[in-house]
C-alpha cells in the first residue's frame, strides 16, 4: 500500500487498465474500488505546461503486440496454435520509442520503470500469450518485425537462417507444413508409410501355375492329426478336396487362390510356387534377411508338413 501524501498524483489501475486519481485515504480505484494500483513515474504525469497527457496510445507508442491475436487467428488452420507455441518466455520482441536514435545515458532500471504502464496495459488485455517486450533506444537493421514474422509464417519460409535470433524456432528445419500438426497429423504419416510398403512383397503368381496346383482329398490321417487350413483355421473334413502347394502345405481352394493371385508365396513357409524362398530375398527388399522368420514359420506347422508328406 502506498504511503499517504498531500498530492496523490496519477496512478494506474491494473483492473481497469486506465490512469486514475486514487480515492484517499485508502488509495483505491474510484471506478472498481480495487487496491491493485501503481503510482506512475513523475515524467508521465503531466507536461511542462501543466496539461495532462492523453492516455490514448499513438501508432508509434502502441505496444508492438497490441493486435497479435488478430494476426495469429487469421492464419490458416493449425498455424495460430503453432505461432503461439513459439512465443515462450525466452522470446523477446524489441520496442522502440518514437524518434529515439541513440542511447540517452539513463539508467536501464529507470527506463523499465518508465515503460512499466504500457507493459501492464498490454498484459491486462492479452493474458493468453506469454510475451516479453524489450526496450531499445534505436532501431537496428536486421531486427524482425511482428508483421514480417507473421508474413513469413504464412509463406512457410521461416528458417533459422532467416531469423537467427529466434532460438526456440531453431527446431524447425523445413516448411512447417512438413510436420505433423493436430490429432490427424500422425495418422496421415503412418498411412503414408504403410502405403509405401504395400507393394514391396512378392509379385502375383502365374495364373497357369495356380491352375496347375493339384487337388487332393483329405484322408483319415489328416483328420486324426487335427489338420486345419492355415488361412481360415477351419478343420478339414474327411474326403474334402483341398489344394496342395509344392511345399506340401494344404489349403482350401477359396483361401489359397486369392492369396496367390496377389503373392507368389506360401502363407506358411513363404516359398514360391517355383520352390524359391521369398522370405530370404523378397523382391523390393534386397539386402534384408528374414531367415529367422522363415525358420520359425516353417516350424510353426509341422503337422501340416508331416501330414502332407504322408499323403
UniProtKB/Swiss-Prot annotation:
Tissue expression profile of the protein: Highly expressed in liver and testis.
One GO biological process term is:
regulation of cell population proliferation
Name of the protein this chain belongs to: E3 ubiquitin-protein ligase RNF126
Q: Where is this region: Disordered?
A: 42-64, 94-132, 277-311
Provide the taxonomic classification. Answer: Eukaryota, Metazoa, Chordata, Craniata, Vertebrata
Extract the ranges annotated as region (Required for interaction with BAG6).
Answer: 5-100
Q: Which reaction does it catalyse?
A: S-ubiquitinyl-[E2 ubiquitin-conjugating enzyme]-L-cysteine + [acceptor protein]-L-lysine = [E2 ubiquitin-conjugating enzyme]-L-cysteine + N(6)-ubiquitinyl-[acceptor protein]-L-lysine
Residues with the modification N-acetylalanine, per the entry, are 2
Q: Which residues carry this modification: Phosphoserine?
A: 5
Task: Extract the SMART domains matched here.
Answer: RING
Q: Which UniProt keywords apply?
A: Acetylation, Cytoplasm, Metal-binding, Nucleus, Phosphoprotein, Transferase, Ubl conjugation, Ubl conjugation pathway, Zinc, Zinc-finger
Q: Where is the composition biased (Polar residues)?
A: 47-61
Q: From the UniProt record, give the pathway where this protein acts.
A: Protein modification; protein ubiquitination
Modification after translation: Ubiquitinated. May undergo autoubiquitination.
InterPro entries registered for this protein in UniProt = RNF126-like_zinc-ribbon, Znf_RING, Znf_RING/FYVE/PHD
What does the UniProt entry say about where the protein is found? Cytoplasm; Nucleus
Q: What job does this protein perform? A: E3 ubiquitin-protein ligase that mediates ubiquitination oF target proteins. Depending on the associated E2 ligase, mediates 'Lys-27'-, 'Lys-29'-, 'Lys-48'- and/or 'Lys-63'-linked polyubiquitination of substrates. Part of a BAG6-dependent quality control process ensuring that proteins of the secretory pathway that are mislocalized to the cytosol are degraded by the proteasome. Probably acts by providing the ubiquitin ligase activity associated with the BAG6 complex and be responsible for ubiquitination of the hydrophobic mislocalized proteins and their targeting to the proteasome.
Entry text on domains: The C4-type zinc finger is required for interaction with BAG6.
Zinc finger regions typed RING-type: which residues?
A: 229-270
Q: Where is the composition biased (Basic and acidic residues)?
A: 103-116
Region annotated Sufficient for interaction with AICDA, chain positions: 200-304
**From which organism does this entry originate?**
Homo sapiens (Human)
Amino acid at each position: 500500500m502506498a504511503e499517504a501524501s498531500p498530492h496523490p498524483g496519477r496512478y494506474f489501475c491494473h483492473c481497469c487498465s486506465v490512469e486514475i486519481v486514487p480515492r484517499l485515504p485508502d488509495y483505491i480505484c474510484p471506478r472498481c474500488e480495487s487496491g491493485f494500483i501503481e503510482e506512475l513515474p513523475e515524467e508521465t504525469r503531466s507536461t511542462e505546461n501543466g496539461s495532462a497527457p492523453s492516455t490514448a496510445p499513438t501508432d508509434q507508442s502502441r505496444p508492438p503486440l497490441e493486435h497479435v491475436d488478430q494476426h495469429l487467428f487469421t492464419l490458416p488452420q493449425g498455424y495460430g496454435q503453432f505461432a503461439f507455441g513459439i512465443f515462450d518466455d525466452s522470446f523477446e520482441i524489441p520496442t522502440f520509442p518514437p524518434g529515439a536514435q541513440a542511447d540517452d545515458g539513463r539508467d536501464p532500471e529507470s527506463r523499465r520503470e518508465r515503460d512499466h504502464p504500457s507493459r501492464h496495459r498490454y498484459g491486462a488485455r492479452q493474458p493468453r500469450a506469454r510475451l516479453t517486450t524489450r526496450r531499445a533506444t534505436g532501431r537496428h537493421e536486421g531486427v524482425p518485425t511482428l508483421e514480417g514474422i507473421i508474413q513469413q509464417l504464412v509463406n512457410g519460409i521461416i528458417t533459422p537462417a532467416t531469423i537467427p535470433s529466434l532460438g526456440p524456432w531453431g527446431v524447425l528445419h523445413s516448411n512447417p507444413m512438413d510436420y505433423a500438426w493436430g490429432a490427424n497429423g500422425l495418422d496421415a504419416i503412418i498411412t503414408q508409410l504403410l502405403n509405401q510398403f504395400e507393394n514391396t512383397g512378392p509379385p502375383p503368381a502365374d495364373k497357369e501355375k495356380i491352375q496347375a496346383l493339384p487337388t487332393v482329398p483329405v484322408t483319415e490321417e489328416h483328420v486324426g492329426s487335427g489338420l486345419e487350413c492355415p488361412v481360415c483355421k477351419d478343420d478339414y473334413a474327411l474326403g474334402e478336396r483341398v489344394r496342395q502347394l509344392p511345399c506340401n502345405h494344404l489349403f482350401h481352394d477359396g483361401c489359397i487362390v486369392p492369396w496367390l493371385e496377389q503373392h507368389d508365396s506360401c502363407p506358411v513357409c513363404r516359398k514360391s510356387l517355383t520352390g524359391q524362398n521369398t522370405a530370404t530375398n523378397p523382391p523390393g527388399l534386397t539386402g534384408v534377411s528374414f531367415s529367422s522368420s522363415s525358420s520359425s514359420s516353417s516350424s510353426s506347422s509341422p503337422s501340416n508338413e508331416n501330414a502332407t508328406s504322408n499323403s
